[in-house]
Curated annotation (Swiss-Prot), chains A, B, C, D, E, F:
Homohexameric ring arranged as a trimer of dimers. GO terms for biological process: rRNA catabolic process; rRNA processing; tRNA processing. Its EC number is 2.7.7.56. It is an enzyme of class 2 (transferase). Pfam families: RNase_PH, RNase_PH_C. This is Ribonuclease PH. GO terms for molecular function: 3'-5'-RNA exonuclease activity; tRNA binding; tRNA nucleotidyltransferase activity. Belongs to the RNase PH family. Keywords: Nucleotidyltransferase, RNA-binding, rRNA processing, Transferase, tRNA processing, tRNA-binding.
Length: 238, 238, 238, 238, 238, 238
């Protein structure tokens, strides 16, 4: 039995709100149950030094958690003067995920930065960030098309992410915080709209897991991502 | 004529939403027109080293701006590894303002941290932070009373803040970003519910200002703070 | 009764010594009683990146306190690896004050940095820094004129600063350390030679202050600045 | 055809040299072809603050790369003043992997730090670090047993790691640098001696990968880890 | 011929002014010609962690250079967020020199910090720091004796330092900046009042130097230190 | 009697292994008894900003110690976020020593960085670094000659370094760790192949030393360096 009474293969309620703030070229609030992440896309008309003159663009991501997004206050990274290893790991993951579905040459010599800031955390913030940031990225590229700066949107496919895990012996989809902090295996799967796997990160927190368990978990994740892609489509259609 | 068509003594629409997030002891979204700041209050049952064993509590504040809260993206302080001078100045101001209306001895040996994070900026973020943080602080203290940890709320009076300035030669109340970036004098006034001045910071961006101008500006601010205190009361009554 | 036996409207002895060190384009030791600040002006023939090619100059300030300028040794900021919020707040204030009285276009594409280093502290170091730095700035500009690099001194007016406050219930001018650490209200006022207000920063350390108190304090400050401007004139005439 | 002429399922030559340096409680040089990592285990008789008094030990890891371990010199992290996100990601991975096979309660209130320093890099440094660090950890625990500080070695099983990937369309085992920098999918698999999966991290550098490809890759990795575990056993028996 | 017209074995004018500032337990301005260093000694009634409970005290030093102590402004270390290698090297040298002549056991469990801040630089600032800091240290210990905290001054002997070098082929004593920046060999010698060598640091900036040259340089330094010790004695007697 | 049973004028066994790693232009493992330092030379085809366009090259050095190179683990500088003063002092020394024997103009506008990383420490790491780095530097320059980028090797002479000291009252050559941590005087001498002194750094850890002792120590060092230069020659001839 899951603490939230959800079925093993049931996602939390997903809500994707576009135009949550007004300055960014793409601005999306994504909610997965009580997890809420603000994802903004900012377009800059230049690229980082290592790409100058190479005729292609770049997509990168930064991730942050408001100090009191969590049950107990965590210290502010800006005040401590450095980002934790966890933060850096997550923002690298988000960047890789998004770059896997955009044609960087078609983007031209510009950079899009996705800022994913967690306003409230209840597990699964890195997956929600990827799913929400994709919408913000798509929106920002659309504005470049509308402004006549690009002939077509260079985003080639959807990308979304979901966590799965083994909780009290059973495989479950979309772990919330109570599950996440008490599970045996935790796996994040990033997939495209076409169903290709872009990234898989599975960790045994307790007992090692087996090939069979892994297979069931990826099945669950595939199901979850399919729902998330549908939610992205609805959000863009709205 | 103000860009927003407001009267010289007209505040922007003020909205104070309590319980905006669920983990913090106090959580308030304050909106002054398009400026939106999330203020959370976090209670910790200990005090910083310099106060240990002194039989009193402490109230402190931290301030941050999401990278794309502004028209163009500003770099993330956590990524740069340090807070700007502006950020430090603002968080020191918020802390002083709140400490002026709370009985720290009555609070006991605990610390309350107010995190003010700007989700969207359109001028006046430090004033909005003070006004919103006061509500979050009050709420957090109320919970301590409800939990039987304090006999009475140690917050003795309201405190709120507003900016005033001389824009195109005329004194105006509550500057928004277009006014703020093009005014001659910019003044932030922090006042209590009883009308006492807690802090005044006036800066001539262009021409120096006179005693008379200063007097008119403080009148306007007094009016503005009165409205803000009423908004705080409504929010608490809701 | 003031600890120093001064009258409420009496400044400490002001001494401004030019050419205190030999390398800087302007070098001034200012003493306000036991407070001693070394202010040097350094001219560089280029401007910071944000001003390049804009046809104007820049004036900026840095502030430091020697570790044992104070009663007990404070740790060295260079050793800790960062400047405190207080230091940053003060150096921003000094920079703004000086920029308010210089014609940056007339200065041309060069930068003048004012270093204000406190050799001995007895209250009022930020105000002494502004008053002393103005002399160093003027002197540095004069050398540019003498060297034929500028047709006329771009400094348009004096600027000086003084603290006022409410000590044991009475308004007093030019707080020294014993007063500063035990006063109800502390206000720093920056004014031009013509009497315009450039910056006012008032803080209630204890009880909030009233409009009437504020008015008396600004009167006292006006008086104080007038004396300081005279001291600046004497120093330049010497 | 692989650049190294190896068969798709062929590991590079593995060499594990114990007692490579003399001060550490465990000191192992692991070589996977031209990749060489020095892994040392250091025992300290206390635990980090978050574990004090909890009756258990801790195992953690740090990772570094000598500036010229690589084809072109990379800058020294100590000189830059911070570790890259990649470094932090790797050292977190090594720590998790090792903790998965040690009984931390049986270790008692002591910490073992595994330092993995890459002397020469040719791909697969994080996997080599895990495989080598396990030997150093085992050795350090053995010394605690010999010294009578522990009744039995708390390491419960082997753990080793290997990279697999899709290179020029074909699944291959143990990527070297030329393969790693030109592959479509790169996957690191951490497994125990009993064959359980502890961690799996797969990333599509180019095209997304399929369930079937993933399955073949995990088969290859299982084979590779089996060889590595045998190499660990030989090294301990030597 | 030396730029300053001095004889090869002639020191610059030495001036040691005690009580230059009022808060420190020892406060000395030392001038070697145009080089001016403020040396303060601060006594704290505890020792650094590595000495706690060992029944002895500690003497340490910090060194800084005001940004415009030099011909062209150098950037402020506090603003850059770190001390240069040169600064660290010098403060380590000053600390070692002073510790060589004090009985740390007799000092008891307290620490004396010597802050050496260069107000104006014209070569030889590290040597002047040592010579001046010794006087400040002696003075601070004397106050501990006068306060009844120590039975006798734990400083056992004088220590002073001087630079020597080979300038235009000739050995000279006490290099000033024009000589220092254009010499072949630069040597700093730290000696006790009894004539023992505490530290010698010689560097060939151009051609390597010979045993014979080294011998002549140490002779010159011995002479110089003898004069400096006399100056220290006069300062203490004043 | 020395702990190692060596004669007072006996070096530890010196071993210089070239091509210890494969990527660097010069790669040398130097062993002085149990002290082992990996020295690599990296050539870059540009110079640091302060030398651009000056028609000369630059040689610089960085130094590091693996955390468990020592008896007890020391913390990793990259993790702490800064290099110690000792590290900076050593790397500055290595750089100066090498620059003293290379014709920087003949090197052309390129920079060679010597990375000296201590794999195992038993005293004398800075001296071993200089002696080993010289071989790596020579080798890297040789490769530039072989590649036709330089007409001749710009290294003009050997340079090597050795420590000497007064241990239990007697002058000894090449201190190992047990001697180094218990000696009265410790001196590092850097000399050229021609016998010129490039750098001498002597420190009295206990009693000050005399002119006579200094003379004996330099004699010993001269002897030691002669052996080291021979070892460098053998290594290059191999």
């Amino acid at each position: 039995m899951r603490p939230s009474q959800r079925q093993p293969d049931q996602l939390r309620t997903v809500r994707i709100t576009r135009n949550f703030t007004r300055h960014a070229e793409g601005s999306v609030l994504i909610e997965m149950g009580d997890t809420r992440v603000l994802c903004t896309a900012s377009v800059e008309e230049n690229v980082p030094p290592f790409l100058r003159g190479k005729g292609q663009g770049w997509v990168t991501a930064e991730y942050g958690m408001l100090p009191r997004a969590t049950h107990t206050r965590s210290s502010r990274e800006a005040a401590k003067g450095k980002q934790t290893g966890r933060t850096q790991e997550i923002q690298r993951l988000i960047g890789r995920a998004l770059r896997s579905v955009i044609d960087l040459k078609a983007l031209g010599e510009r950079q899009i930065t996705l800022d994913c800031d967690v306003l409230q955390a209840d597990g699964g913030t890195r997956c929600a960030s990827i799913t929400g940031a994709w919408v913000a990225l798509y929106e920002a590229c659309d504005k470049l098309v509308q402004a006549g700066k690009l002939p077509a949107n260079p985003v080639r496919d959807h990308v979304a992410a979901i966590s799965v895990g083994i909780y009290k012996g059973a495989p479950v989809l979309d772990l919330d915080y109570p599950e996440d902090s008490d599970c045996d295996t935790d796996m994040n799967v990033v997939m495209t709209g076409a169903g290709g796997i872009v990234e898989i990160q599975g960790t045994a927190e307790g007992e090692p897991f087996t090939r069979e368990q892994m297979s069931v978990l990826v099945d669950l994740a595939t199901l979850g991502v399919r729902h998330l892609v549908a939610a992205q489509q609805s959000a863009l259609a709205a």
